[in-house]
Amino acid sequence: MSSLLNFYRKVLNVPLSLLVKSRAIPTDPVKELNLNLEQPIIYVLPYTSQTDLLILQKNCLALNLPDPLQNNELNGQSLPRYVFLDEGRRFFKSKGAKSETESIFYRYLDLHRNNESLDVQLIPASVLWGRSPGKESEPHLRLMSSFQRIISMIWFGRDNFVRFSQALSLKYMVAEHGADEGIAQKLARVAKIHFAKQRYSAMGPRLPDRQAMFNKIIQSPAIKAAIEEEAKTKKISIEKARQEAEKIVNEIAADVSHESLRIADRVLSWLWNKLYQGINVQNGDRVRKLALEGHEIVYVPCHRSHMDYLLLSYLLYHQGLVPPHIAAGINLNFFPAGPIFRSWGAFFIRRTFKGNRLYSTIFREYLAELFYRGYSVEYFIEGGRSRTGRLLEPKTGMMSMTLQALQRGLTRPISIVPVYIGYEHVLEVDTYAKELRGAEKEKENAGLVLRVIKKLKNLGQCYVNFAEPIQVNNYLNQHFPEWKESQAEDSRPKWLNEAVDSVAHQVMININKAAAINAKNLIGSVLLASRQRALAREQLIEQVDSYLQLFKNVSYSDDVIVPNDSAEEMLNHVLTLPRSGVISEKDSFGEMIRLDRESAVLMTYYRNNIQHLFVLPSLVASIILHHESVSKDLIIKTVNRIYPFLKAELFLHFEENDVRNQVEAILTEFSAQRIVKYESDVLQINRARVRALQLHAAGVREILQRYYISLSILLEHPEISRAALEKESRSIAQRLSILHGINAPEFFDKALFSTFSASLKAQGYFDSEGNCILEKAKEAEEILRSLISVEVQLTIQGAMEKVEEVENTETVVKTAEAVTEKNE
């Protein structure tokens, strides 16, 4: 039988090699699953299939894993390196009987009784053919004929995945539970349950009958009440209001097609190969683990580009997970993109629906229905794409609906997965720069898509990092234990608003904790730190290397992606990128690297992607640079005073009582790099490396200038309203940016001044009547003034005087006009 089986496998390998292109998940199981190749491995497949076994063998050999068709030789015994859990339908009965599998498990367990050094690793491995879960109306079990199986191999041969799961230590099993036959049976049962969960995590719930789902949503009590109110308010019939509700549901709802997803996979594979030199994915195992544990997963990525929608779904598909239902702006619902996106899982949301109770109720019920049915969901918490490269303040509407769905009694736990997405080139960055200069946002349409497609070429690297998940049930139990208390159907729980804001803010913090440093954003940051946007090649490489050492030795967080390339390799890479704006020039003194003028503004976008990583070291460097000689205690005191503003603006994760340790680590690293002299708790400039200190300090320069502008105005006008403070601060910042050549468009972004004024209020700079507390503001202003050049101070003071002159003139004119009107 063995020779006949081997012959059958050889024959079967011929069509498999031609028709099947398989992908492994994870792509590097030895590293990601922490496998020990010095110890034996046994592969467990869910059911008997020689086809699956041969595909597993091919993947194992490609990944440098032991060949499953070779036996393990242990203590004089020759044991198979694979087992099948269920018999299934098969031609040969040499493997796969359930009793035989349990017998093999028992023999492996028994070997551990007298061999303490042995630790056999049991690896569940399943082969997926296609990813469609089927429709709700279809039967659960469908037997395929031989012809159908051949067709399936042809059709799904390029949609084949081998999923390796976390290895189970048999040494641990024996130590904890013993090695009798009962344990072998239990092992088989547990493996069976694992495969069922794994299949569900890869395929998801069955697709609904769309019309039946619509009818269920429309019949919900909340929507019935909203329909009645709509009819009453607009003085129309109930039937007409119901038709409007059906129209809204149809406008919102996705219409997922797995055949469309398979086609998208082919198209996007071609697109990414054309666009990017590589897509770097980190921490996908976190999401796979949550899916296996049965969590309802909500993906919340930062929003850099329209590419984000496509990229994340594509990567999740290739991580062996179900692509989520994606909340997309209604602006993307144009022909032909709208129907295509809808078939890929997009459901559409209007930009605003304030005051439209019918729409808001339907949307909330639709989202709750997705959660109820077990579909993963994705939405962009920033509301729109960031035009500056920084995270925007979160829009909390979708988060509120998510927490309300949980509070309504969702049985599965919800886990929110923040996702950092970063690019070495964002397709829309030119458009963003125009919009920041005041141009109107161009409406999305087919023509715009075609113009973007023309730009498709080498765009460098792309990064996707799955940040630390937030298990919402646990988070609410810890911070808002009252969430479990029952509430009336129509009432809004008191805890909800605060909880929504808290979770949303934590999402932003976790996204920034998972930032990716790449060649473009790091080299761009260093060049922008130089006032002339140019450095000698040697100086640039030295500074980039200084940052790399800093990021590795004083980690912002364990999730940050730090390049393994050298500074030299990173520079060479950026110089090869088209439209990077980084130019190499030579003169009699050597090679210069500079940013061209037009690209400087665009480069601030990429700098802002990672500014939060170096803002604290920059602040420390700035304090030392301006004081020349300063005690460690004064540095920490100064940082503690400014840090709350930085934390609010840049979503920093350090709590205020952790800042001291981080500052001390930064000082130690600066000293190790000989950037400063550090003796007896006193820091001094090292003249030999003062240029490096200046470049480090420049990373926070513009932020401190903005803070100084607002505090200067506050001291001059203590009773000024917050709205007027933000407006006047922005006007002065615009003038300062022109006079001092500040290229960053966000320097006078009204949102940043709004965030700062909110931070001032939160930190107690205003009294109960909204007036400035002068003593506290004066202390902060003096600290900031010590870190800002005299030239900038004079410009700000001059601008304030100009503003006052204009205001006085306007007052005189208005008074004169009033007198004239009175006389007339």
From Swiss-Prot:
Endpoints of the signal sequence: none
Reaction catalyzed: sn-glycerol 3-phosphate + an acyl-CoA = a 1-acyl-sn-glycero-3-phosphate + CoA
Membrane topology category: Peripheral membrane protein
Residue interval(s) of motif HXXXXD motif: 302-307
Gene Ontology terms: biological process: CDP-diacylglycerol biosynthetic process; fatty acid metabolic process
Protein's UniProt name: Glycerol-3-phosphate acyltransferase
Domain notes: The HXXXXD motif is essential for acyltransferase activity and may constitute the binding site for the phosphate moiety of the glycerol-3-phosphate.
Compartment(s) where it occurs, according to its Swiss-Prot or TrEMBL record: Cell inner membrane
GO molecular function: glycerol-3-phosphate O-acyltransferase activity
Keywords: Acyltransferase, Cell inner membrane, Cell membrane, Lipid biosynthesis, Lipid metabolism, Membrane, Phospholipid biosynthesis, Phospholipid metabolism, Transferase
Cellular component, GO annotation: plasma membrane
Stated family: Belongs to the GPAT/DAPAT family.
InterPro entries: GPAT/DHAPAT, GPAT/DHAPAT_C, GPAT/DHAPAT_LPLAT, GPAT_PlsB, Plipid/glycerol_acylTrfase
Cell membrane keyword on record: yes
Claim: Repeat is one of the keywords in the record: no
Pathway(s) this gene product operates in, as recorded in its UniProt entry: Phospholipid metabolism; CDP-diacylglycerol biosynthesis; CDP-diacylglycerol from sn-glycerol 3-phosphate: step 1/3
E.C. numbers: 2.3.1.15
CDD domains for the chain: LPLAT_DHAPAT-like
One Pfam family here: Acyltransferase
EC category: transferase
